[in-house]
Curated annotation (Swiss-Prot):
Organism in which the protein naturally occurs: Salmonella paratyphi B (strain ATCC BAA-1250 / SPB7)
Entry annotated with the keyword Oxidoreductase: yes
UniProt keywords, alphabetically: FAD, Flavoprotein, Oxidoreductase
InterPro entries per the UniProt record, alphabetical: FAD-dep_OxRdtase (IPR006076), FAD/NAD-bd_sf (IPR036188), Me_Trp_Oxase_MTOX (IPR023493), MTOX (IPR045170)
Any Gene Ontology CC annotation: cytosol
Record-linked NCBIfam families: PRK11259.1
Residues that bear S-8alpha-FAD cysteine: 307
Assembly information from the UniProt record: Monomer.
Cofactor: FAD
Name by which UniProt lists this protein: N-methyl-L-tryptophan oxidase
Similarity comment: family membership: Belongs to the MSOX/MTOX family. MTOX subfamily.
SUPFAM superfamilies documented for this protein: FAD-linked reductases, C-terminal domain, FAD/NAD(P)-binding domain
């Protein structure tokens, strides 16, 4: 059998692509080296932020606004919502370049973002402490996503729509010829007209020339009470420290508040190098500088987890066809800020398989930018 689209890697982007391509009427085969959702990639740990006024640059805003519409639609397929509109407050020095990008994105796209000075911040959320020179940019329409529930939902919907799924079966080789794409797996060879490579952190095992660096990252849950929950209207947050370190976190659930540090981490070259949480001496204390200064009422570390970023050299996404192979799309280099975009990236992959022109300007995400 020849498929219209084979998906190599069915985590966040791959799961979304499988659903949207199958829903569009294509014959699709989803593959993964493990059984998604799983612990080997970048999607576990229950929650991920979604921000609209984007500190990483306004080129992302059209993508994230489309993603939000798709998240809202996906949430209707579950009793438990996938998207929680908790609001997100972005904290940092008034001269922060990241916050300047947030403000610029909000102005350009007329987004609902409120600017709060330090006094107003601490009045609205007495649990938060910031220096006098800090501001907060509050996005009331943003919030967080339940990442593993999202992937489970996409996989179920794709399967119900007739998508073939081959999991716990790593792809060992990809071959291109005039008839399309062939993949080799432990279960045999499979053929398709087109392929999506969304293999996440270890994409270089299949495409060694891609400029992607795996980075071991950790996040942890700390003791918190009801003051820090959505029931008390406590928001999700990002925070920039005076030294430039960036943190992110979520409202407390079941008296546990999850927080992680976005920058830093350990460069790794193989899956076995991603040691579990607490295997690196600094893991448990990584969030202390932020908690001690900004959320001093939070208690001790309860547990944590390790994940992996697939960083590109400039930490912007890679969305492009493989050089010399126009029938193979690569989506990688999501650099620790990609999950919120998963549905729109999956939709882009489905449009690619359908032969449609993308609805977005993907020029900033081309591979050619690294050879200029």
């Amino acid at each position: 059998m020849k498929y219209d689209l084979i998906i190599i890697g069915s985590g966040s982007v791959g799961a979304a692509a499988g659903y949207y391509a199958t829903r569009a009427g294509l014959k699709v085969l989803m593959t993964d080296a493990h059984m998604p959702p799983h612990q080997q990639g970048s999607h576990h740990g229950d929650t991920r932020l979604i921000r609209h006024a984007y500190g990483e640059g306004e080129k992302y805003v059209p993508l994230v606004l489309r993603a939000q519409a798709l998240w809202d639609e996906l949430s209707t397929h579950n009793e438990e919502p996938i998207f929680v509109r908790s609001g997100v407050v972005n904290l940092g020095p008034a001269d922060s370049a990241f916050l300047a990008n947030v403000a610029r994105s909000a102005q350009q796209w007329q987004l609902n973002v409120e600017r709060l000075d330090a006094t107003a911040l601490m009045t609205r959320w007495p649990e938060i402490r910031v220096p006098d020179n800090y501001i907060g940019l509050f996005e009331a329409d943003s919030g967080f996503l339940r990442s593993e529930l999202a992937i489970t939902t996409w996989l179920r919907l794709a399967r119900e729509a007739g998508c073939a799924q081959l999991f716990n079966s790593p792809v060992s080789h990809i071959h291109h010829d005039d008839n399309g794409v062939t993949i080799e797996t432990s279960e045999g060879c499979y053929h398709a007209s087109k392929a999506l490579i969304s293999a996440g952190t270890w994409v270089k095992a299949l495409v060694p020339e891609l400029p992607v660096q795996p980075v071991r990252k950790v996040f942890a849950w700390f003791k918190a009470d009801g003051r820090y929950s959505t029931k008390n209207r406590f928001p999700a947050f990002t925070g920039e420290m005076p030294n430039g370190d960036h943190y992110y976190g979520f409202p407390a659930e079941n008296d546990e508040l999850k927080i992680g540090k976005h920058n830093g981490g350990q460069l790794i070259q193989a899956p076995e190098e991603r040691k579990p949480f607490a295997a690196v001496a600094s893991d448990g204390a990584e969030a202390f500088p932020f908690l001690r200064n900004v959320l001093p009422g939070i208690g001790g570390c309860l547990h944590g987890a390790a994940c992996t970023y697939d960083n590109s050299p400039d930490e912007d996404f890679i969305i492009d066809t493989l050089p010399g192979h126009e029938n193979t799309l690569v989506i990688t280099g999501l650099s620790g800020h990609g999950f919120k975009f998963a549905p729109v990236l999956g939709e882009i992959a489905a449009d690619f398989a359908l032969g449609k022109t993308p609805s977005f300007d993907l020029t900033p995400f081309r591979l050619s930018r690294f050879s200029q």
